Every structure is written in structure tokens, then in C-alpha cells.
């Protein structure tokens, strides 16, 4: 507001999603000069296209980035150097409310206490790499790009040119599983090093 305070305009802006949000990334995926948002959730993710007037439109289905599992993080980056932002979405684990496991620990008094189960109690799920088609849609290129790994329990992805060769590489932080460092081969594929 210009006075050191913020005003909640999520409803007016059209981003008042009622899901269980776990992460968000920002990037201009359609090259119109306005920053768009990708929201990851325990449940359906949402891609919000910035309309340039202070509002956003949900274009998740038309953009073909509608994951419905437990996604925990995402990151925009131009891995194929074609001038538009691609999208990597990390997925946490194969967890369903109706299949919830009960986990217990024994406290110092010898009593069993119910706790949230750690990540290793659940099988991991594969993350997804979406290539931007340049027309407002994306294609899932996870397997052919070499980043398919079903055991991940992905938390947070980050694009960076760690080897300084002119193309961005991908680091994925995981829970209860080793992290992934995918080196960009410069031809649309990656190698997990």
C-alpha cells in the first residue's frame, strides 16, 4: 500500500486457490512481459497466466500441466535454449489420505506416541519436466530427457549452469533420498551425475 503494509488481493487477482499449497514458482512462460505463477499442491497444481491487468487466469488444463499428485516444488528455466521457459515440477511421495499409515515413536517414558510418518515410509513418485512448446502449451518430456526417476521424493528444484558451459543444469533436493544433479547435455537430454 506504500505505507509498509500489504493488502490481500488474492481474490481480486483470481489466485485465491483453496488447495493445500506446498510451493510456487514465477516466470514469464508465454513471453508476454508479465510474470506468471505455477502453484504446487497436495492435489491439483495450478498454472496462473498473468493477464497484465492485475488479474490471473487458470490455464492449467489448456497448458497441459495438470498434475494431481503431491507436488512439492517447481522451477521455470529454459533448459533447451529456445527462448521460452520450460517447467520442472518435483513430486513428493505416493500418499493418499484414505491410505494413511500410522507411525509411532516411543518417548523417554516408554509410551508410544502417534507421529507424522517420515518420507521413507512412502514410495517416491517421479518428477516431471515440461518442455514449453512456444504456443501456450507444454509437453511432458520427462523420460526422453533423462530426468525420469520414480524414487525421488522431490522437494525443490533449481536451475543453474553449475558447469559454466552455457546451458542450465538442474539440481533437485529430495527428502529421504539422495539429491539429484542433472547435467544438461546440450541436446535436450540430461545425465544424473
Regions found by a protein language model. Name each.
Residues 1-193:
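Acidic, glycine/proline-rich Ca2+-coordinating loop motifs
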Amino acid at each position: 500500500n506504500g505505507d509498509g503494509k500489504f493488502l490481500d488481493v488474492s481474490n481480486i487477482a483470481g489466485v485465491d486457490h483453496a488447495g493445500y499449497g506446498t510451493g510456487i514458482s514465477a516466470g514469464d512462460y508465454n513471453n508476454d512481459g508479465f510474470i506468471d505463477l505455477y502453484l504446487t499442491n497436495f492435489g491439483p497444481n495450478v498454472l496462473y497466466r498473468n493477464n497484465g491487468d492485475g488479474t490471473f487466469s487458470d490455464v492449467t488444463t489448456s497448458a497441459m500441466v495438470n498434475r494431481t499428485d503431491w507436488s512439492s516444488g517447481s522451477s521455470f528455466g529454459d533448459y533447451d535454449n529456445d527462448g521460452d521457459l520450460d517447467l520442472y515440477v518435483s513430486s513428493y511421495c505416493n500418499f493418499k489420505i484414505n491410505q494413511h499409515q500410522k507411525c509411532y515413536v516411543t518417548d523417554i517414558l516408554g509410551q508410544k506416541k502417534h507421529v507424522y510418518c517420515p518420507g521413507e515410509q512412502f514410495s517416491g513418485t517421479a518428477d516431471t519436466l515440461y518442455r514449453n512448446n512456444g504456443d501456450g502449451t507444454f509437453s511432458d518430456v520427462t523420460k526422453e530427457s533423462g530426468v525420469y526417476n520414480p524414487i525421488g521424493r522431490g522437494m525443490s528444484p533449481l536451475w543453474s549452469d553449475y558447469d559454466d558451459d552455457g546451458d542450465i543444469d538442474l539440481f533437485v533436493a529430495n527428502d529421504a533420498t539422495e539429491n539429484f544433479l542433472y547435467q544438461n547435455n546440450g541436446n535436450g537430454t540430461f545425465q544424473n551425475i
